[in-house]
């Protein structure tokens, strides 16, 4: 994958564009993003570009340490967040929280 590209499931597009989703939680394979890096955002399903984001921080976290604050930044409840993470990464327990903001 292009090092300046990130994908999201289409269901998250509107939350990202509206500023309701300001973090993403990824596994080690996507932990190399750097603060201030500009990423082109595409849909996972169709590879359609829809935004640019700037990485604000990349912070390691264990699954059990996910909190209501993380869920709020994902625009979900904590049980929803934990369920989504386990659906996407069923074998993982260590993740990276990538905080971001939309850029023009």
UniProtKB/Swiss-Prot annotation:
<dbReference type="GO" id="GO:0005829">
    <property type="term" value="C:cytosol"/>
</dbReference>
<dbReference type="Pfam" id="PF04266">
    <property type="entry name" value="ASCH"/>
</dbReference>
<dbReference type="GO" id="GO:0016813">
    <property type="term" value="F:hydrolase activity, acting on carbon-nitrogen (but not peptide) bonds, in linear amidines"/>
</dbReference>
<dbReference type="InterPro" id="IPR007374">
    <property type="entry name" value="ASCH_domain"/>
</dbReference>
<feature type="active site" description="Proton donor">
    <location>
        <position position="74"/>
    </location>
</feature>
<feature type="active site" description="Proton acceptor">
    <location>
        <position position="21"/>
    </location>
</feature>
<keyword id="KW-0378">Hydrolase</keyword>
<feature type="domain" description="ASCH">
    <location>
        <begin position="7"/>
        <end position="104"/>
    </location>
</feature>
<dbReference type="InterPro" id="IPR008314">
    <property type="entry name" value="AC4CH"/>
</dbReference>
<feature type="active site" description="Nucleophile">
    <location>
        <position position="24"/>
    </location>
</feature>
<protein>
    <recommendedName>
        <fullName>N(4)-acetylcytidine amidohydrolase</fullName>
        <ecNumber>3.5.1.135</ecNumber>
    </recommendedName>
</protein>
<comment type="function">
    <text>Catalyzes the hydrolysis of N(4)-acetylcytidine (ac4C).</text>
</comment>
<comment type="similarity">
    <text>Belongs to the N(4)-acetylcytidine amidohydrolase family.</text>
</comment>
<dbReference type="InterPro" id="IPR015947">
    <property type="entry name" value="PUA-like_sf"/>
</dbReference>
<dbReference type="GO" id="GO:0106251">
    <property type="term" value="F:N4-acetylcytidine amidohydrolase activity"/>
</dbReference>
